[in-house]
Amino acid sequence: VLADSSLSDVWIEDASVAATCLLLQAEDLGLGACWVQVRGRQTADGKDSEQTVRDLLGVPQRYGVCCLLAIGHKGMERKPQNEDRLKWEHLHTERF
């Protein structure tokens, strides 16, 4: 998921919202999806992940690379987290 960083100073947020919408749409279509973080990360050999993606895909430098999304058919269906195992003490409403 890319965004033109020359057009917006909030390109990271814009790309994150777009990626989230794609993840939700994939689920709605019965597909599985996984966010692969790129921005601010390095490859196993220490290279900048954003630049690696730019080089592999021919992405112009002005585009920021937020993430990759792997989308496909699910190998298995996971059950939602059991609510009694959730750490509700980490949830704050109206005040911290």
Segments predicted by a language model, with ranges:
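Acidic, surface-exposed loops and disordered segments
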Residues: 1-96
